[in-house]
Amino acid sequence: MDEDEKKDMCPICKTDRYLSPDMKFLINPECYHKICESCVDRIFSLGPAQCPYEGCDKILRRNKFKTQIFDDVGVEKEVDIRKRVFNVFNKTLEDFDNNQDDYDKYLEEVEDIIYNLDHGIDMEKTEERLRTYEELNKQLIMANLERSKQDVANFEQRQKFEKEMKLKKRLLEKQIEEEERANREWAKREIVNQLTVNEDAEEVIENVKKTVKLKKSSARRKLEELNKVLRNNPYMTMTNGRMKKKDTVPFTPFNGDRDLHKRYELVENEYNDSFIRDLQKKKEYIASGFRADFIYDRMLTEAFMGLGCIISEELQSS
């Protein structure tokens, strides 16, 4: 019997998915042995019992069984351990006064505990360490759990708010597009009508343009207000009633390393460089997508990119 057949067969009752397509497998976090739902109901319905796997002496309870999420039981076990440990060791960077070094040491300690529990290293000592920390920090753990729940609620509210605003924005943009199309059609007809009584074409066109400009729709004004609301999204700056500090990221000039408008022009389509010309003939370069015009373009970009870049002005606009 190959591994795929074993995967779809209950090791206790030997029923497989070929005969029972609706069969579900369950696992228990005590030992992570896979058992079909029928066997779980049959063996554990009267109360706790020993795991039916040969050589396993773990006592299992019916209410502890759950559906396996990951194909790899090792991954399933690690995820459960992480969930359990992080419910106890739930400090955040703010609890360390934003001291990254102290927070990193704390995370390293947590990872050591997870590793020991996952690999069965010093189990008694590690479990005792976990229990001791939980008893000594009950209030902090509960406060962080409540804060975490509040952060999740705020995130969901923010998602809902942004979704509603973006939907309104799309509707307004569609309305503006339709109004602009109607204004263009009206302008064409109006120019033709006015030219029948006024021979000065430039004056007619200018008057029609002014009229169209004055027809600035209420939808456009609403769109501008909506964009302001999105930029000043209250859910982006507040977390659980506290002002969220803006992430400190390195400032990158040149529009984020992207020069959208090239600061140079090539007078000639081709530049003759003997070294580059020889590379274009080599198969290993051609196979990798080598192109001489990309090389020249990159060299010129690097040479001209910093020209006209005033850091102080870019900092103000960023």
From Swiss-Prot:
It is found in: Nucleus. It holds the Pfam family MAT1. Keywords: Metal-binding, Nucleus, Transcription, Transcription regulation, Zinc, Zinc-finger. PROSITE patterns: ZF_RING_1 (PS00518), ZF_RING_2 (PS50089). One of its GO terms (biological process) is regulation of transcription by RNA polymerase II. The keyword Zinc applies. It comes from the Eukaryota. Acts as a component of the general transcription and DNA repair factor IIH (TFIIH or factor B), which is essential for both basal and activated transcription, and is involved in nucleotide excision repair (NER) of damaged DNA. TFIIH as CTD kinase activity and DNA-dependent ATPase activity, and is essential for polymerase II transcription. This is RNA polymerase II transcription factor B subunit 3. The lineage of its organism: Eukaryota, Fungi, Dikarya, Ascomycota, Saccharomycotina.
